[in-house]
């Protein structure tokens, strides 16, 4: 996954930056918009995967402890209720995307949400803590 999909996003970022620079030099506005869109897509894929890699463990995982466990209990009622809500977010994605557990720094609480495709437009003030890749290749 790392050497294929994530590497393709990094290459896509580099290619889009080069093509964007060329399009700007030529005042080719159609190409500018296309390459800005491509840059956003590939940069989103890179960012999402970079967060996801940090969520993985060779030994699997278990229920969190400490402050995170307390925050999950406060926000969702229990770890099992969080798992049910997070699973619903993941399984409810239409098409490709990501399920996310994030810390809302403005509201001082945890929440779950979905990112579609490779969007990296996480809501303002949200810090992603856990992301699950729900693309068909995952």
Swiss-Prot record:
Provide any one GO MF term from the record. metal ion binding
Which segments of the protein form a coiled coil according to its record?
none
Q: Which UniProt keywords apply?
A: Manganese, Metal-binding, Oxidoreductase
Give the E.C. number(s). 1.15.1.1
Cofactor, free-text remark: Binds 1 Mn(2+) ion per subunit.
**Which positions does UniProt annotate for Mn(2+) binding?**
1, 49, 133, 137
| Transmembrane annotation, as ranges | none
Q: Does the keyword DNA-binding apply?
A: no
What SUPFAM superfamilies does the entry give? Answer: Fe,Mn superoxide dismutase (SOD), C-terminal domain, Fe,Mn superoxide dismutase (SOD), N-terminal domain
Catalyzed reactions per annotation: 2 superoxide + 2 H(+) = H2O2 + O2
Give the first-level EC class, as a single word: oxidoreductase
- Cofactor or coenzyme needed: Mn(2+)
Pfam families linked = Sod_Fe_C, Sod_Fe_N
Q: Does the keyword Manganese apply?
A: yes
Q: Which family does it belong to?
A: Belongs to the iron/manganese superoxide dismutase family.
Known PANTHER family for this protein?
SUPEROXIDE DISMUTASE 2 (PTHR11404), SUPEROXIDE DISMUTASE [MN], MITOCHONDRIAL (PTHR11404:SF6)
Q: What does this protein do?
A: Destroys superoxide anion radicals which are normally produced within the cells and which are toxic to biological systems.
Report the protein name in the record: Superoxide dismutase [Mn]
Q: Give the originating organism.
A: Mycobacterium malmoense
Q: Which gene encodes it?
A: sodA
């Amino acid at each position: 996954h790392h050497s294929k999909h994530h590497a393709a996003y990094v290459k896509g970022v580099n290619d889009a930056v080069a093509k964007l620079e060329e399009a700007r030099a030529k005042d080719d506005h159609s190409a500018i918009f296309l390459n800005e869109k491509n840059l956003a897509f590939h940069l989103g894929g890179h960012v999402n995967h970079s967060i996801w890699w940090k969520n993985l463990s060779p030994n699997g995982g278990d229920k969190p402890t400490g402050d995170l466990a307390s925050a999950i209990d406060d926000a969702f009622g229990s770890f099992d209720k969080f798992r049910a809500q997070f699973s619903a977010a993941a399984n409810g994605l239409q098409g490709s995307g990501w399920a996310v557990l994030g810390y809302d720094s403005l509201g001082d609480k945890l929440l779950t949400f979905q990112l579609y495709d490779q969007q990296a437009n996480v809501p303002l003030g949200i810090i992603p803590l856990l992301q699950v890749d729900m693309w068909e290749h995952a």
